[in-house]
Amino acid sequence: VTCDLLSFEAKGFAANHSICAAHCLAIGRKGGSCQNGVCVCRN
């Protein structure tokens, strides 16, 4: 999942990070965040 496609902000809240974290949780990781336009999951 690339964060560039999901990137938008509402009142300072970056929704792409939440979508990335949800994606990572869905594949069994402990969450994640966007780094340089790429969703990086935590182990």
UniProtKB/Swiss-Prot annotation:
Q: Name one GO cellular component term.
A: extracellular space
Q: Any one Gene Ontology biological process term?
A: humoral immune response
Q: Tell me, in one coarse class, where this protein mainly resides.
A: secreted
Location in the cell reads: Secreted
Q: Which SUPFAM superfamilies match?
A: Scorpion toxin-like
Q: List the disulfide bonds.
A: 3-34, 20-39, 24-41
| SMART domains, sorted | Knot1
What's the short name of a Pfam family annotated to this entry? Answer: Defensin_2
Which keywords fit this entry according to its UniProt record? Antibiotic, Antimicrobial, Defensin, Disulfide bond, Immunity, Innate immunity, Secreted
Superkingdom, taxonomy of origin: Eukaryota
- Stated family: Belongs to the invertebrate defensin family. Type 1 subfamily.
> Function, please?
Antibacterial protein. Strong activity against the Gram-positive bacteria M.luteus, B.megaterium and S.aureus. Reduced activity against Gram-positive bacterium B.subtilis and weak activity against Gram-negative bacterium X.japonicus. No detectable activity against the Gram-negative bacteria E.asbriae, E.coli, P.aeruginosa and S.marcescens.
> PANTHER family this protein is in?
DEFENSIN
- Name listed for the protein in its UniProt record: Defensin-A
What organism does the record attribute this protein to? Answer: Anomala cuprea (Cupreous chafer beetle)
